[in-house]
């Protein structure tokens, strides 16, 4: 009987701890693509973190290496946060885009995502636009080599 009481107490304490200190569940990241002539837009929704950065990495690298898309634009309007592993995935995508002579651009960066890229001195490395229209109408440089748009975004 004493063991049952201890087990109940332990279970109760564990549940209380989990309720107080658990990380809130966030919606999963979603990725989809759209096509405008030779331009592929990758729509990303949700945070890009250590837990899901392999998903965006797989999607982007598949488009660049396997499908050889000439122009890839990543829609980040619905990405509130990017951690260091997400940044690493974007940097790898940029490198692969350059290797395969594809254009790689970002648009719609949240303030948080933009700050991360600024702090890491990567904002000027990427081709960055504020809107989809700007990204679609921009000259078609290869893989972020034209830095003129990154300063205005």
What are these regions (language model features)?
Residues 127-131:
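Short acidic-hydrophobic, aromatic-tinged amphipathic segments that line or gate anion-handling sites
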Residues 6-8:
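Targeting/processing segments of secretory and organellar proteins
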Residues 47-126:
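Amphipathic alpha-helical interaction surfaces in cytosolic regulatory modules
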Residues 10-43, 152:
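Short beta-strand/loop segment at the start of cytosolic alpha/beta domains
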Residues 133-153:
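A charged, well-structured terminal subsegment
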Residues 53, 132-133:
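Residues at or immediately preceding the N-termini of alpha-helices
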Residues 36, 77, 133:
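Conserved catalytic submotifs in the C-terminal HATPase_c
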């Amino acid at each position: 009987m004493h063991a049952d009481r201890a087990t109940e107490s332990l279970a109760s304490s564990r549940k209380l701890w989990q309720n107080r200190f658990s990380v809130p569940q966030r919606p999963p990241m979603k990725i989809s693509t759209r096509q405008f002539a030779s331009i592929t837009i990758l729509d990303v929704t949700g945070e890009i973190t250590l837990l899901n950065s392999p998903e965006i990495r797989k999607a982007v690298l598949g488009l660049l290496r396997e499908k050889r898309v000439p122009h890839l634009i990543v829609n980040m309007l619905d990405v509130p946060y990017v951690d260091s592993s997400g940044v690493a995935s974007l940097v790898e995508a940029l490198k692969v885009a350059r290797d395969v002579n594809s254009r790689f651009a970002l648009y719609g960066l949240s303030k948080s995502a933009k700050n991360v890229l600024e702090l890491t001195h990567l904002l000027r490395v990427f081709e960055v636009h504020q809107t989809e229209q700007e990204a679609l109408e921009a000259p078609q440089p290869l893989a972020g080599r034209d830095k003129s748009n990154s300063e205005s975004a």
